[in-house]
């Protein structure tokens, strides 16, 4: 019983939490990216210390008390921030025929030609903050960061981050 044995078993469990044939997200799906990683206090903009994470979340509407209802979520590590990999992520996680809401990134325009209904809900120069225009991904990113800070103390290496994202997805869904 060593730390290495426990760590290895936890990673095996994290890998087992994802079904390769899981259903695609459907309905209204919000897609965005966020950054996960170590603390970068006092800096603005994209940090080189943090890892870009792609987020897709079903928006199930709002309840009577105006609280946002979220459906299932999908998370994946991105190679670089703002990459076209985000479009491929949307293709592989969202069912055709769904409404995909994104920020003003031009790369998403191709989705309208591939059987998706695409809606820009904000642009880079929008006066509305992201948590207002794309509340689903921002809520999930906030929960993910709090979970990472509280459970793992910001100590998840990039090479293992996808396993931790899979665990978070399993717990969230």
Regions from the PLM with identified roles:
Residues 1-173:
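Residue-level recognition of single "structural anchor" positions
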């Amino acid at each position: 019983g060593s730390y290495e044995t426990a760590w290895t078993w936890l990673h095996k469990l994290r890998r087992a939490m994802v079904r390769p044939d899981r259903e695609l997200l459907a309905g209204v799906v919000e897609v965005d990216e966020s950054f996960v990683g170590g603390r970068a206090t006092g800096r603005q903009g994209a940090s080189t210390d943090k890892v870009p994470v792609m987020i897709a979340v079903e928006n199930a509407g709002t309840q009577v008390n105006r609280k946002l209802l979220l459906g299932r979520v999908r998370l994946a590590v991105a190679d670089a921030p703002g990459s076209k990999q985000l479009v491929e992520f949307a293709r592989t996680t969202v069912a055709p025929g769904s409404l995909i809401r994104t920020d003003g990134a031009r790369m998403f325009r191709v989705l309208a030609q591939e059987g998706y209904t695409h809606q820009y809900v904000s642009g880079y120069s929008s006066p509305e903050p992201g948590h207002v225009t794309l509340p689903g991904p921002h809520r999930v990113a906030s929960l993910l960061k709090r979970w990472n800070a509280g459970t793992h103390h910001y100590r998840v290496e990039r090479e293992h981050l996808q396993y931790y994202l899979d665990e978070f997805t399993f717990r969230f869904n």
